[in-house]
């Protein structure tokens, strides 16, 4: 029980830290930025009220994957401040980032108190965006990564994105190993066949 409560406290503290970093690194806020701020405040509430998991993956590999997923977006922003990148297609990038923000917000609201960053079994959500793919939150991360890199990129940001995506793939497999213990999981997998990209994977 202590470990689980510590995880809730850690999520709360990390989210507060993310908010501080977001305000420090963002000179002017767009609507998309405010959507992400709103999401962070929602996570703060969830961290204090969410259900305790029935099963939890405490492995070092999962911890490393979660850490990588938290670090790589901010590492891109910081590196681009030190070494400016190239502009590819800003308009398309803005569209993707906006779509990603909307998808992640809807996904977070759909998850509610079942939200977590470490693979855990708190319940099974099959409604909303989870009726289209099994991991819509990670799809939003990928859309955002592509969008931000269309606005500005260099070889280092691309490398960071690849590392981040590798961590997401690991987390998907780790989460599905845990979720497979839910009685309704087999039926859900039949109903929603694809993890991230309909028709592909």
Feature-to-residue mapping (PLM):
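Solvent-exposed interhelical
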Residues: 122-140, 190
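Membrane-anchoring alpha-helices and their flanking helix-loop junctions
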Residues: 1-118, 147-201
